[in-house]
Amino acid sequence: MDEEENSEINSVQARDEDVQLEDQQSQGLQDRQVDVIEQAWNNAMPDEPSPPAEDAFQDPLATDGEGGDALEAMVENVLQDDTASEGSHPSSDMSLESPGSEDDSDLESLPHWMIPQNRLRSAVDMMVSQARNRDGGIAALLSGDNFLQRVRSMVFSQERRRSRTSEETSQEAAEQPVDPPPQQPPRPPIDIGFDTNLPAEHSYFGNHLSRVPGVDYLEVGSVHHMLIFLHQHILFPGEVLPFMIDGRMFDEDMPGLDGLIFGVSFPRLQPPEDNPHKLYGVTCQIYERGESGRGLVFYKSRALQRIVINCDDIKGSPQYIARNPTSKCFSKVKILPEYFLPEPLQTVDMGSMARFRDIPSMRDKYRRFQLSTTTWPSDACQEYSFSSIVERARQRLESQKIDTMPKCPIQLSFWLVRNLHLTEKMMRLTFLTDSVNTRLQLIKSTFKDETLFFCRYCNSSLALCSDLFAMSKHGVQTQYCNPEGYIHETNTVYRVISHAIGYSGEPSTKFSWFPGYQWHIILCKFCAQHVGWEFKAVHPNLTPKVFFGLAGSSVRIGKASEYSPFNGTTYVVRNMMRMISSDME
């Protein structure tokens, strides 16, 4: 009997020791989580972030602040993690009404005392959404006592709610549509009392530029040896590229000085893993030049044709044209073709009835006669109709006050890409295709998409693409050059989402891209990164009185389904959760 009692006592003591050990491990983990959270919060979201100096934001490429780089690197890591896990870990819902919205695939591999990462993320999202309407916001949430205990309580509350919800309710919640972005007040008609030719002339370079004659289109498929540069933005044929560079880069003895042609390639257009031995770009031809008085020369050039470069043919080290290149780089480039097939019905020979084709009152009847002679259904012909795509694009751009739409199908396809603001993936597809018809079909597929501008650094929403309008005759997106030679791709919008931006420095009228307007640097409210400029009229007769220019290097285009009013805040808190997870590993 004594042996049985001793055995039972020993087993109880062993269980107590195991429980005590688990409690110690859990407490140690919680202590580490608290330390990491406090450190991450202090680094990522200071209570009163001091705005960077004005000089630092003359161009985002010129800033090398340690804090900005650290936050940018941290944000890029999270973006990569989110992209990589998109298929297996869908974004958690912030509502308790959506049980089972997280992936449970990682539950079995974790100790029972550790909260799974997806459950932790869901609980933190809920706490963030509740804290945003309270005094103090997120800072008060993290500075309060027993933060981890409240996270655990929220996790357990969600678990209990999930267990009480039936499978039918879960399926119904999963099928609920994504909340659309908040409805902004209807935009009043924009009355532009401004000469839109001025930005297109880049008059901030001065009035002493001289014209350079010649516009040369090179033969399709031909190979040429020319000077090449790199560029951080994607240029499409027809765009104007202003830049400032050392005049010695273009020697007088170089062939073809009249309308000098050079190549500009885009490293971000072609991912290295796709085809590491090729670079895609455009040929550019200089049409105006002028001295700056500082040993640099102002140039205006226009993109003409798409090219492909074999990296093995590059002689030298290519440099970015926006960063004052100091050495020349030459390479062989091949001119890419542009194939365009006429509309299907235009290939149908109607004989003597063809004379009715251009009579407006007979056009519909003539079309019906054409359709009756083919095996194609009317919908198929309408789907690939060039005039149909042009009309739909015209209706979509009607609110942007653009009246310079080209009539040539090739030029129109490139022009639409610049003014419809496609996602980066779609821009890459439209640039790489040689078929104008395919390019127009890709553009047409985006007509129904509602898109927004998101901060490239923290993913918070900044403006609606429907608020774009043209302050230049070239359209809503234009390349501009600042006094330091950096080139900015600028998108002009009528307004931004409320409480999305802050300001840095003082407003100025020097080197203004829009004569008669002063510019003021704007920052993302969540991450304090440079995202563009506010332009305000200094003359009473100019309209609009205020508009915004979003820097293409600091924003990205995304679908409206990605919008969330918590995007920026939740992103920072999720970033801290990632750091906790990596620290535990």
UniProtKB/Swiss-Prot annotation:
InterPro entries: CULT (IPR034750), Lon_prtase_N (IPR003111), Yippee/Mis18/Cereblon (IPR004910)
Database matches in Gene3D superfamilies: 1.20.58.1480, Peptide methionine sulfoxide reductase (2.170.150.20)
Compositionally biased intervals (Polar residues): 80-95
UniProt protein name: Protein cereblon
Gene Ontology cellular component terms for the protein in this record: Cul4A-RING E3 ubiquitin ligase complex; cytoplasm; nucleus
Entry PTM: Ubiquitinated.
Effect of disrupting the coding gene: Viable and fertile however, adults and larvae display an increase in body size and tissue growth as a result of increased cell number. Overgrowth is due to an up-regulation in insulin-like signaling both systematically and in the fat body, which in turn results in the down-regulation of insulin-like peptide (ILP) inhibitors, conv and ImpL2, and thus allows increased activity of the ILPs. RNAi-mediated knockdown in the fat body results in an increase in pupal length, adult body weight and posterior wing area.
Span list, region Disordered: 1-109, 156-195
Similarity remark: Belongs to the CRBN family.
Listed GO MF terms: metal ion binding
Tissue specificity of this protein: Expressed in the fat body (at protein level).
Pfam families (alphabetical): Yippee-Mis18
Domain Lon N-terminal: 225-451
Biological process, per Gene Ontology: positive regulation of neuromuscular synaptic transmission; positive regulation of Wnt signaling pathway; protein ubiquitination
Subcellular location: Nucleus
Compositionally biased region (Pro residues): 178-189
Sequence ranges assigned to domain CULT in this UniProt record: 450-559
Involved pathway(s): Protein modification; protein ubiquitination
PROSITE patterns registered for this protein in UniProt: CULT, LON_N
